[in-house]
Every structure is written in structure tokens, then in C-alpha cells.
């Protein structure tokens, strides 16, 4: 059953032969503010508008769960380095109003077999709203 997707790059799903999910997603929503400092008065704030939203998405990749960790990591790296713009959907609903770009990915290679096959890894991808 599909949980959601990050464009065609990753489909998050749970089935009898494959588990690919994220855990602990963090979404940050901020405003942009200027600070004016008049002499002899407290600083004045001025709202400039909304800032780009960001998401941090930790993902566990395991060959035991029907996922190819090395292939998935390579595809994520390509998306980062090529500036790929992607829709992000969870539960059939878009996350935010706009599409997203992956601004970075941090990988941990947990289990590498003696023949060099990566069988278990974690990756945290950093997304930023694309406007």
C-alpha cells in the first residue's frame, strides 16, 4: 500500500514484499522579519513575508525489506546534484502548496557485505519548497 511519494524518485509503501517508509519527518515553517533600531527606542519588527518551508526526512533502507539501498542512494544523489523539482505527497495530499527540491542528503552505510553490497543504510534528505 502506497503511503506517499517524492515525485517518481521514491514511492513510500508497505507491502508483503517491500517496506520503504520515513520516520520522524520534521517540517519547518517560518516568517521573514526585519528589525529596525530607532535611537532611544525598542527595536521595531517588520514582517517581510513567508520564508520557504523546509522538511527533514529520515529514511531507512534495507535489502531485507525489498529495497535496493545503493540504487536508492544513487538516485537521491542524482536528484540533489541535478536540482530536480519534485512533488511531495503523503496520504494522497500534497505536503505544502508548492513542489520541493532536495537541497542535501546525509547517508549512513550501516551494513556492507564482504562483496561490497550495501544491504542496510539510513539517509536523511533535506527538502526546500520550490517557488
Roles of regions detected by a PLM:
Residues 1-131:
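Compositionally biased, intrinsically disordered low-complexity segments enriched in polar/Pro/Gly
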